[in-house]
């Protein structure tokens, strides 16, 4: 496999481009050292300059100062803990809630053993794994959305 494409110098359009200094990246100029030593550092420094300039012109707001004596009415975890928080909030027995949280990875570990005879990578040809994935995604999104509602509306998402 050739690294450099040899130019067809019988083409008059190419001759005109090469005479004007155009077409050299496509016809014969190697990437090392021309592009890697000159163009890439310019792009990298330009990106750093833009990021630093934007951070200086518009710094992130620090928010209001912390007050340990004024706590919010309802404390919510980070967004990626919303489904787990909703499970612990809705299930009346806390031990059952913790067991359900442990059942999620245990159930995911069983999927390869259930579907071990199917060697396809196409998700449409692996119905059990696809169903587990889609059902888990829908349940996680439902629980995550429900955790942002008050406790009396969290199961119905305020719709009923």
UniProtKB/Swiss-Prot annotation:
GO MF term set: electron transporter, transferring electrons within cytochrome b6/f complex of photosystem II activity; electron transporter, transferring electrons within the cyclic electron transport pathway of photosynthesis activity; ubiquinol-cytochrome-c reductase activity
Annotated organism of origin: Stigeoclonium helveticum (Green alga)
CDD domains in alphabetical order: cytochrome_b_C
GO CC terms, sorted: chloroplast thylakoid membrane; mitochondrion
Record protein name field: Cytochrome b6-f complex subunit 4
Domain of life: Eukaryota
Ranges annotated as spanning the membrane: 36-56, 95-115, 131-151
GO biological processes: mitochondrial electron transport, ubiquinol to cytochrome c; photosynthetic electron transport chain
Membrane association type: Multi-pass membrane protein
Known partners and oligomeric status: The 4 large subunits of the cytochrome b6-f complex are cytochrome b6, subunit IV (17 kDa polypeptide, petD), cytochrome f and the Rieske protein, while the 4 small subunits are petG, petL, petM and petN. The complex functions as a dimer.
Gene that this polypeptide is encoded by: petD
Keywords on record: Chloroplast, Electron transport, Membrane, Photosynthesis, Plastid, Thylakoid, Transmembrane, Transmembrane helix, Transport
Intracellular or extracellular location(s): Plastid, Chloroplast thylakoid membrane
